[in-house]
Amino acid sequence: MPWLTVLFGVMIVPLGAVSIFFIVIQPIVIGTYSTLALIAAAAMLLQIPYAIDEIVATVQFLIRRHRAGRPWLLVFFTGDTDEGTGEIDRQAFERKPGVILRDMLSGGITLPWSLLASIGVALWLMLSPLYLTWDSPVAAAVHICGALALTVSVTSLASVVRMARFLNVIIGVVLIFAPLVTGGSVLAYLTCFAAGLLLIGLTVPRGPVGGHYGAMNAWIR
């Protein structure tokens, strides 16, 4: 049912954003991380690319049904058949559990090396206040940029919103200039400058894209 898919997305994306917000403010406000909050935020963040892929597929399905003359609101709540040959691939029901699990985990997302490297840089930024110390004027800015870069990079794993990775360019520019505004040690300058350049450079490769997304293919760059 389309409404169920949209409800799933509405539950995942906003709740994921709230969890990430708590992770951003915790070290700044209370000076430490919460293990349970980190686990919850990681679980929600990993679901965001899958939720976005499902929402896009649902919207495209509703558009196709509307163009076919079906009332989209009725289709939204009751469902409908889609375009196609109507043939059933019986071999799909005979696959091994491992193959099915792999298809479930890789459906709608790919793992380009550039985004995986961006995730690594983001985690490095989030942990950098541990050696920069929270007394450093730039520590909070580095931590926030790391959390935002992690969110952007994980979300961009969804092929249909791969262009979202270019938000890391903005984060990279902020990192490069943050120590100049707030001040900091030489180590802080080097950390921000290196991480900023890495984030900007890693946005260039798009990486492989799996599947076809209809009209959205033109936006996958």
Residue map of PLM features:
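Secretory/periplasmic and organellar redox-cofactor proteins
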Residues: 1-123, 127-128, 202-221
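Membrane-helix interface "capping/anchor" motifs
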Residues: 1-6, 155-167, 208-209
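Membrane-helix interfacial "entry" motifs
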Residues: 2, 184-188
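Cytoplasmic-side transmembrane-helix entry/capping segments in multi-pass membrane proteins
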Residues: 5-10, 163-171, 192, 219
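Non-cytosolic membrane-interface motifs at loop->transmembrane helix junctions
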Residues: 30-40, 139-140, 189-194
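Extracellular/lumenal glycan-associated surfaces
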Residues: 114, 118-134, 148-149, 153-156, ...
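Short amphipathic alpha-helical linker/capping segments at the junctions of internal repeats
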Residues: 141-148, 190-200, 217-221
